[in-house]
Regions:
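Active-site-proximal betaalpha loop/short-helix elements
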Residues: 103-180
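Acidic, Ser/Thr/Pro-rich beta/coil linker or hinge segments at domain junctions
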Residues: 201-250
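General beta-strand structural signal in soluble alpha/beta enzymes
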Residues: 24-28, 67-70, 127-131, 153-155, ...
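Helix N-cap motif at beta-to-alpha junctions
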Residues: 188-193
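Active-site glycine-rich loop that binds ribose-phosphate moieties when present
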Residues: 44-56, 99-117
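Solvent-exposed alpha-helices and their adjacent loops that cap or buttress functional pockets
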Residues: 18, 32-38, 57-61, 86, ...
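A short beta-alpha structural unit
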Residues: 181-187
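Glycine-rich anion-binding loops of enzyme active sites
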Residues: 1-87, 212
Length: 250
């Protein structure tokens, strides 16, 4: 049920998050509507940026390194822990593990603001892209297509927490195609990779180089993303729907 205290809690969270980023909350409207059994929040953020400082998802260059922060299936971990606790308990999960997984929304968190700021200050960044629905696999296709390049990705270097891997194994989803809000793909000059990874590490953010930009796109064909696994190359797996959506509709 909608209560005054619930409204106050939601708007206090919005105000706190905006305050941390120096963002002003302008306007707002709230109402109680039949047919909804939970709060629904919609927002839009507007801002200005120096045109010389804009970093797009379309800026990858041949020879660039591609980094990934935090890891695969961050938001998926929290969603499954919150929505399927009994299923996970049946797989031997403790209440402590469930609470930790559910808290992935805040730790490691689904914001990439700090990741982007640190990376931009530490090295020469050409492209940024945040994986969401469809996971990191889909995001790789998106950033390659936007930039008009081909990518080589090393499956063995893709970061994923032990808790996320365990959860995905237990419910039968592929973390590569599961919603990964909180992760950030960073395209950078190869020589600045270590500097960026180390700068992120000082703030407690895990990052790893997961691949390289192989070449510019050849006219007449789409961008290619290939995956190296066990010293052999294979096509990147494709996910027509997010693994979370598949899980909940089966």
């Amino acid at each position: 049920l909608a209560t005054e205290s619930l409204f106050e809690e939601i708007f206090a969270q919005i105000a706190d998050a905006c305050s941390q980023l120096g963002v002003s909350v302008a306007g707002g409207h709230s109402e109680v509507t039949t047919g909804l059994d939970r709060p629904l929040v919609i927002g839009q953020m507007l801002g200005e940026v120096n045109s010389n400082e804009v970093i797009r998802s379309s800026g990858l260059l041949p020879g660039d390194a591609l980094l990934l922060t935090k890891g695969l299936a961050i938001e998926a971990t929290s969603i499954v822990a919150r929505e399927m606790p009994d299923t996970l308990r049946g797989k031997g999960w403790s209440d402590r593990d469930l609470a930790e997984a559910a808290n992935y929304l805040t730790q490691p968190g689904i914001s990439v603001v700090e990741d982007a700021r640190i990376a931009q200050a530490a090295g020469e960044i050409h492209a940024l892209h945040d994986p969401t629905e469809g996971g990191v696999a889909t995001a790789l296709v998106e950033i390659a297509t936007a930039s008009g390049v081909d990518l080589d990705i090393d499956a063995d270097t893709l970061p994923i927490s032990l808790l996320s891997q365990r959860l995905c194994d237990d419910v039968g989803i592929d973390p590569f195609g599961a919603i990964s809000s909180g992760a950030l793909l960073i395209g950078c000059t190869a020589g600045t990779t270590r500097t960026i990874v180390d700068a992120l590490a000082t703030r407690g953010i895990v990052a790893a180089q997961i691949g390289t930009v192989r070449s510019g796109r050849v006219e007449g064909r789409s961008s290619e993303v290939r995956l190296r696994r066990d010293n052999s190359w294979e096509a990147l797996p494709q996910f027509s729907v997010d693994e979370i959506a598949r899980l909940f509709t089966e």
